[in-house]
Swiss-Prot record:
Encoding gene per record: gdt9
CDD domains registered for this protein in UniProt: STKc_MAP3K-like
SMART domains, alphabetized: S_TKc
Coiled coil region boundaries: none
Identification of the protein by name: Probable serine/threonine-protein kinase gdt9
Transmembrane segments: 967-987
Entry EC no(s): 2.7.11.1
Comp. bias (Basic and acidic residues): 998-1014
Extracellular side: 17-966
Keyword line: ATP-binding, Kinase, Membrane, Nucleotide-binding, Serine/threonine-protein kinase, Signal, Transferase, Transmembrane, Transmembrane helix
Family: In the N-terminal section; belongs to the GDT family. In the C-terminal section; belongs to the protein kinase superfamily. TKL Ser/Thr protein kinase family.
EC primary class: transferase
Length: 1577
């Protein structure tokens, strides 16, 4: 016996279970350290706290175990079990079942399950005192049960019972049908149910319990009648007022007549889930459970023996034990609550509480008189709440929370959360004082007992993150409904430790105790009235998107930053800044973009100034709500602070979009835009610019106003535009008033210094090239511990004491080229904080009394997790915050600011991020040439050399006195339109009959070049642009000089990549400048005409000029200003023409195509290789790859310059014959026919633009007239991937289908099997084709056909999609007997089955099982669900437009929706769709009657499709005259053939989906289909 006890104790110790003895009147206890046994992330507490231990009563001792092999749960299966109040134990491996219609009664007192027990439908409600599910146990019930007090048992000191305690395994409580119904009010006592029910299921014995805004805790009404399965009439209660819109009805008799769990005991029961239990509760009524009241927690206290920590000598029973809620879940991540009705009767703490769990809540109705509807304790890092309705009667006496006792959630909250991630979608909150209450725990690590209190998932540092971090907070609240019906009472107040709710009701209350730095909260698609957001985020950010706020909405509390996007307010939100903490006044930085603010008629809006540079407030003021229904502001330019050079022109633009087609829509004949300036006469600022009022007529075609603005003085302009009806007689009547962001006008700036980041490797270590997806990292600590020249961060970036860098720096190389352009390889290395949220500080020496322009280039690599990554920038310790939306993919950002340095020797720039945003480089510009104070050139050179060994960076000193320097960093807020230099018209074929005197043959050898590598970087230098900067402080960088643009241009720079590869020469230098001669403006942005025939100019600086410059260098250096640098007006980056780091290896010439026209022109001349030494002409490059180190951008113009040299003493004429423009690309040159003198070198520039995804391998003919020689220059360009395809890359196979539109082919594109829909150009509706291309290009979903691309040209019009091996659903179910074609008036464009390897042929119909049909229907519904979420109505849903990919019902994907030619995108302001499109037998009433329709038209079509698939008959086949179908559908008639033979649930779903009114959404349809499928499966 002693041996057995020893083994048992060892097993318990191994499992972490400790047995605790108690006084004899109590159950003995078991103790588990919940964090060690339940938290499976490999992290152990650093501090052992009492709440880490989990105690529970050992009620399973002395229970009766089942007889081995017994399967029926009856008395005889348990030896010597009593008839009533038995204490039973189902052993491990035993599987027992209660028989249907079995009456258990009071058979069970205590039931412990280590095996499994299943209670099927039909078992009479039974009683139970304690249900314990042990690890590995499984309890499943589809019938009701009641809790009762334990009989003849010891006392449970921890108050778990009566109730359920799970320690692992699974708990499934599943009801067979819905128990609650949503309803719309028809009258005080009449309602329309949103779900069809059987009227015969109810009689006068039933009661209808109604819950609404006026009856939060419900009222019971008499059941009168149900007509048509939808219309409910009640009586014997108060009428529901018309103001109530959220109405739910619960039918019940005395015995409920539904699946329920309630308590018949003297005290309520509770359900306690622990130990990673799998929980699924659905369609159950949890009634009057929950023991924990809303009073302060008073837990049971165990008094241990001083000499034995396993012996409890006394117990003080707690009066309010925590966590005894209706449902408490801890350490369980697979928890689903769906379509339940949870009602509590006492004033409880909360019916639902979660601790270190991630629950999914869907479609539940939660009614309570409690402190909170749901409480998420710490560790519950994700709550997914969808379509739930939370009704709450706030407590009359909320208690003061106790931080030390973890006592929270008493205020009357909807959701009370101590965790950072909250996701609510279309939830309803009724009656709560605070709908969402988020509270940070002060000193959270100490409370939880972890060094790093990680928000799930908690994981070690990756190459990007060097340590464990706390994730940012992300609140995603999408389309919720909030209703507060208690009025402005004062009986309920918030008594949080740091905030007091004096407004009675808040949408959101956020309490930041200072433990979490710099958090970003986001809200989306709110619609609220008389609500308030209260926040205490002195170092946090709140982002609000798509908010519609009426009445007196406001935001109160303290914020560091507020972002408002795409929202509508009745008044400007009165941001309250008077909330102080420790007596410190806290300020708010606000950005407001694309948002509407109501201003009453007669009131003039006051311009809201941005608090700091970078924040933008540009509301659209309106004084009539009907204006929003007429037209809205689509975009404005500029939309953020903008800078322009003096005397240059900027096009101020307002684009509108109409939102209705009524006759009240303003016409362009009477809408004008009045542009004026706002000057504050009281302001002390002397450089505010004033302009006279200018009226601009609205463009009738483009729907915009464009105001060309040119200012000839420096200063700031505050511009206001009033959009109004010029014929209006009311002085104060207008449509919109817009205050543009401040525009700054200044003189030309020039390049000053540049910094980039490169790695410093030890001389003893070899560098490895890493993948762009796996960046290498070198932390500060690692560098500091190494030797030799690798301690790059030791000295910061010191260069002549001009630059220092803080220690909190981690260097990462091989960042991805997020712009898909090799021109940005400068930005592929960067620095980020070692410690997240701790600043990286850079201190730069600058000259006094000058104005500087700074550019910071950041690369966002990849998300650390699914949460946001905000970026904060500080200048001289002052915040420089920009509106920075969430980023979920690699991206690139450029931030520009100006700094007037009056009397400082340096500037401090710092930034804060989570560790996934990298500062990759920085550029500094000034109005005047700036030089550092330094000694002679030798010492400067010495310092530079020294710094490259130990410092991180090198600052470029720019003191050249004879060469002009401009770095073309082209960045603008609107992405600058493309420069395209068009090819010359018709190529002239020049034939020279002069006899060649020196004939030689060329050899097919690989081309070579004498060009030396000018891209080598100094391996020991941390910060640099290129090594040319470092060679001589008095020498201008040649590469930057060659990138110079024409300084005389007053336009912002075009996005043209310009690369020069001309070799240097002792006597000559070449400065190329390609500037467009003709330009136009579109929408306020620069757009260069593609039809311009003007040539670009090439300026050639002679040696004479160079000599003059050299003779006067010392005198001109300090006097001459550098060329004007194009301004960087905002945060959006276009291409930057920088030097390339490397080139792709050359390929043999034979893969290049030669145009036939070129061959004809050159057929009579002799061919020579371009590098043949016998010909007098020498090319610096014979293969033009335009400097592409990677694939190029489509529609981007790239310019490449080479040099041609005449080695002989004879002049020659050269003719360049270019490939003819085609649909793939356009190439041109600045000089097609030219003379080259003896010994002369001449630059030639080529420009190319690719129009689609293609590989452009062409040859340019070069003819030497006098010698009758010719050669070729090869063009090698490959574009990035896009949806615009090259027709020549499509391989056509057999025809799959055809119609009047054209044909569908099976084919290949780049070895991928695809379907090619080839249109007959000129015979199809181009609008439908373009609409289909546009929609398919926007959407990606597994149940929507994948769009590969398209071909659009004068000759070809194709849509390329993925290929379906089986074919359409119509052909699958009907085969060759597809009769429905006779019922349609449209031609199907289905891709039919042509794959001989498939097991299913579409030549004949295939008999599908019910499971297969349901699986296909689920995929169709999921596809439609996604389309509707994207705002797309398909409008032609039918079997022929559903492609089948697999008929195995267990396959990942079985079906996909196709054919979007008739689809339509919608928006929330305009849903008046009346076009009659689609196929008649699938058209809803609204379409047939040409009435307004919405998403429900697809629901109706789905119902007909689903019906057709289930019965395998053509719909309406019982009607002989097909022309009668529309009138019958309009009258309410629906197909009946075979409908009654279907499964009841399937039949009901079809009836609901094609009902005349109140059709379900596809969210509900998917849910219903999945439930039906599971039943069949």
């Amino acid at each position: 016996m002693k041996t057995f006890l020893l083994i048992f104790l060892l097993i318990c110790v191994c499992k972490g279970i400790t047995n605790i003895t108690t006084p004899s009147i109590y159950f003995d206890l078991k103790k588990i350290n919940r964090f060690q046994d339940y938290l499976n992330n490999g992290i152990t507490p650093s501090i052992n706290l009492t709440f880490h231990d989990f105690y529970y009563p050992d009620v399973c001792v002395n229970t009766i175990k089942n007889i081995d092999g017994s399967t029926n749960f009856v008395k005889s299966s348990f030896l010597n079990a009593p008839t009533n109040f038995a204490n039973l134990y189902i052993t491990k491996g035993s599987k027992m079942t209660v028989k249907p219609n079995q009456i258990l009664g009071a058979f069970i007192n205590i039931l412990c399950i280590e095996g499994s027990l299943e209670v099927p439908v039909g078992v009479f409600p039974f009683f139970i005192g304690a249900l314990v599910i042990l690890p590995g146990g499984n309890f499943k019930s589809e019938s009701s049960f009641r809790f009762m007090n334990l009989v003849n048992s010891k006392i449970d000191p921890l108050n778990f019972f009566p109730g359920i305690l799970t320690l692992g395994g699974s708990l499934s409580i599943l009801g067979p049908k819905s128990i609650k119904y949503s309803a719309n009010r028809l009258g005080d006592f009449q309602f329309q149910l949103l779900e069809l029910i059987d009227p015969n299921s109810f009689n006068s014995d039933y009661k209808a319990n109604i819950y609404s805004e006026s009856f939060v805790t419900g009222q019971q009404c008499d059941f009168v009648s149900i007509t048509n399965g939808y219309t409910l009439t009640v009586g014997g209660c108060q009428g529901v007022p018309s103001t109530d819109v959220n109405i739910y009805i619960f039918f019940a008799t005395v015995d409920y007549d539904c699946t329920f769990i309630d308590s018949d005991s003297e005290v309520p029961a509770s359900i306690y889930i622990s130990g990673d239990t799998n929980v699924h509760i659905e369609n159950f009524f949890l009634n009057s459970l929950g023991k924990t009241t809303n009073a302060n927690y008073n837990d049971t206290i165990l008094i241990f023996s001083p000499t034995d920590d396993t012996n409890v000598t006394d117990i003080i029973i707690g009066t309010n034990q925590r966590y005894r809620n209706s449902l408490f879940v801890e350490f369980s991540n697979n928890v689903t609550l769906r379509n339940n009705f949870i009602r509590e009767s006492i004033e409880s703490r909360s019916p639902l509480m979660f601790f270190a769990s991630s629950p999914i809540l869907e479609g539940n109705l939660v009614v309570s008189n409690s402190g909170s509807s749901v409480i998420a304790q710490f560790g519950t890092e994700f709550i997914q709440s969808t379509n739930n309705s939370y009704f709450l009667e706030p407590p009359t006496q909320p208690v003061i929370p106790n931080d030390n006792n973890m006592d929270y959630g008493t205020e009357g909250n909807g959701i009370y959360s101590l965790s950072p991630i909250v996701s609510f979608t279309t939830d309803v909150f009724v009656g709560q004082l605070i709908s969402i209450n988020f509270n940070f725990i002060a000193n959270r690590s100490l409370v939880t007992g972890f060094n790093y209190d990680c928000f799930a998932p908690c994981y070690p540092g990756s190459p990007i993150i060097s340590n464990l971090v706390q994730h940012s907070v992300d609140f995603n609240i999408i389309k919720p409904t909030f209703s507060y019906s208690h009025g402005n009472t004062t009986s309920s107040t918030t008594t949080s430790s740091t905030t007091t709710n004096t407004n009675s009701h808040f949408l959101l209350n956020v309490n930041d105790n200072g433990n979490e730095p710099s958090s970003y909260y986001s809200f989306n698609q709110l619609s609220i009235a008389s609500e308030a957001i209260k926040v205490n985020l002195p170092i946090g950010t709140l982002g609000i998107g798509n908010l519609f706020a009426t009445n007196n909405f406001k935001i109160d509390g303290a914020l560091e930053r507020l972002d408002i996007l795409n929202s509508i307010f009745n008044l400007p939100p009165p941001i309250s800044n008077n909330f102080s903490q420790s007596g410190i006044l806290l300020s708010t930085t606000t950005s407001m973009l694309n948002s509407y603010v109501f201003v009453s008629i007669g009131s003039e809006p006051t311009r809201i100034e941005s608090q700091i540079y970078g924040s933008t407030i540009t509301p659209y003021y309106y004084n009539n709500i009907e204006t929003l229904d007429l037209f809205q502001i689509q975009s404005i330019f500029p939309s953020v602070q903008y800078q322009i050079i003096k005397n240059s022109t900027i096009n101020i633009t307002i684009n509108i979009t109409t939102t209705t087609t009524t006759t009240t829509t303003p016409t362009t004949n009477n809408v004008v835009c009045s542009f004026t300036s706002i000057v504050n006469q009281q302001s002390s600022v002397t450089n505010e610019i004033s302009i006279n009022e200018t009226l601009i007529q609205m463009d009738p075609i483009l729907n915009n106003c464009v105001f060309p603005l040119s200012i000839d003085q420096e200063g700031s302009l505050k511009l206001r535009v009033t959009i109004k009806n010029q014929n209006s007689t009311l002085e104060n009547q207008y449509y919109y008033i817009i205050d543009f962001p401040e525009i700054t006008i200044f003189q030309s700036f020039q390049f000053y210094t540049g910094i980039k980041f490169i790695d410093v490797q030890s001389s003893s270590s070899s560098s490895q090239q890493t993948s762009s997806f796996s960046p290498t990292t070198t932390t500060f600590l690692n560098l500091l511990s190494t030797t030799e020249n690798s301690n790059g961060f030791l000295n910061g970036c010191q260069i002549s004491n001009q630059c220092t860098l803080s220690n909190n720096v981690k260097y990462v190389s091989s960042l991805p080229n997020v712009t898909n352009s090799p021109d940005f390889q400068l930005f592929q290395s960067g620095i980020t904080p070692i410690i997240p949220y701790d600043p990286v500080v850079i201190n730069l020496g600058i000259e006094k009394n000058k104005t500087f322009q700074f550019q910071l280039f950041f690369t966002f690599y990849q998300p650390i997790d699914q949460y946001s990554s905000p970026l904060s920038i500080f200048i001289q310790s002052e915040p420089y915050l920009l509106l920075d939306p969430l980023i979920d993919a690699p991206n690139f950002k450029n931030f520009t600011f100006f700094y007037d340095n009056l009397n400082q020797d340096s500037i401090e720039i710092s930034f804060i991020s989570r560790g996934d945003i990298y500062l990759t480089s920085m550029a500094i510009y000034s109005l005047d040439l700036v030089s550092y104070e330094s000694s002679d050139s030798s010492s400067s050179s010495s310092n530079s050399s020294s710094s490259t060994g130990n410092g991180i960076g090198d600052i470029v000193n720019n003191e050249d006195n004879h060469k002009k320097l401009v770095i073309a960093l082209s960045v603008s807020i609107p992405v600058a339109a493309l420069l395209v230099i068009l090819c010359f018209g018709i190529f002239i074929c020049y034939n020279n009959n002069k006899k060649n005197k020196n004939e030689t043959k060329g050899k097919d050898i690989e081309t070579n070049t004498d060009k030396k590598d000018d891209e080598n970087e100094n391996e020991n230098c941390k910060f640099q642009f290129k090594d040319e900067f470092l060679t001589n402080p008095n020498e201008i960088n040649i590469q930057l000089k060659k990138l110079m643009i024409n300084k005389s241009s007053t336009l912002p720079p075009q996005s043209t990549i310009s690369i020069d590869t001309s070799p240097s020469s002792e006597n000559t230098t070449f400065t190329e400048s390609l500037t467009p001669k003709k330009s136009a403006t579109v929408n306020g942005e620069i757009d260069f005409s593609r039809n311009s025939t003007n040539e670009s100019t090439v300026s050639n600086s002679s040696s004479e000029n160079n000599s003059d410059n050299n003779n006067n260098n010392n005198n001109k250096c300090k006097k001459e200003k550098l060329s004007s640098f194009p301004t960087i007006p905002g945060t959006n980056l276009t291409n930057i023409p920088l030097n390339l780091v490397g080139r792709k290896s050359r390929n043999p010439e034979d893969k290049y195509r030669t145009n036939n026209d070129i061959l004809v022109c050159l057929q009579e001349s002799h061919y020579f290789k371009p590098d043949d030494p016998s010909i007098p002409i020498e090319f610096s490059e014979s293969v033009l790859d335009f400097g592409r180190g990677s694939k190029c951008l489509i529609d981007e113009t790239y310019i490449y310059t080479i040099s041609v040299k005449n080695k002989s003493t004879t002049d020659y004429n050269i003719l360049l014959i270019l490939p003819i423009d085609n649909n793939t690309g356009t190439i041109s040159t600045d000089t097609q026919y030219f003379q080259i003198n003896a010994g002369e070198s001449k630059p030639i520039s080529f420009s190319i633009s690719l129009n689609c995804t293609t590989k452009y391998f062409e040859k340019i003919g070069v003819s030497i007239e006098e010698l009758n020689y010719h050669t070729f220059i090869c063009v090698h360009m490959e574009s990035e991937l896009s949806t615009r395809l090259d027709f020549s890359e499509l391989d056509f196979d057999e025809i799959c289908g055809q119609g009047t539109y054209g044909m569908v082919y099976k084919g290949k594109w780049r070895s991928q099997v695809v379907a090619i829909k080839m249109m007959r150009v000129g015979t199809v509706n181009c609008d439908e084709v373009y609409r289909e291309m546009d929609i398919m290009g926007k959407i990606r979903h597994q149940n929507v056909i994948s769009f590969i691309g398209c071909v659009v040209s004068l000759e070809h019009l194709c849509i390329v999609t993925e290929f379906s091996p089986i074919g359409s659903l119509g052909d699958l179910i009907h085969g060759d007997n597809n009769q429905k074609k006779s019922n349609t008036n449209t031609i199907t464009n289905t891709i039919t089955n042509t794959n001989t390897n498939t097991n299913t042929s579409t030549s004949t119909s295939t008999k599908l099982t019910v499971k297969q049909k349901l699986r296909i229907a689920i995929d169709i519904a999921r596809g439609c669900q996604f389309l509707h979420q994207c705002g797309i109505i398909h409008r032609d849903l039918k079997p022929d437009n559903v492609l089948v990919f697999d008929i195995n019902h267990n396959a990942p994907v079985c079906a996909k929706i196709s054919d979007f030619g008739t689809s339509k995108e919608t928006n929330e302001f305009s849903n008046k769709n009346t076009n009659c499109v689609g196929t008649p037998i699938y058209m809803s009433n609204e379409i047939l009657e040409k009435k307004t329709y919405d998403n429900s038209t697809d629901v109706y079509s789905f119902a007909v499709l689903f019906y057709e698939m289930m019965i395998e008959e053509v719909p309406f086949s019982e009607i002989d005259e097909k022309w009668e179908i529309p009138s019958k559908v309009i009258s309410g008639w629906r197909p009946t053939k075979g409908l009654n033979s279907l499964d009841r649930d399937i039949k009901n779903l079809i009836n609901i989906c094609w009902a005349p009114h109140s059709l379900p959404s596809f969210d509900e349809i998917v849910f219903s289909l999945v439930k039906i499928f599971k039943r069949f499966n």
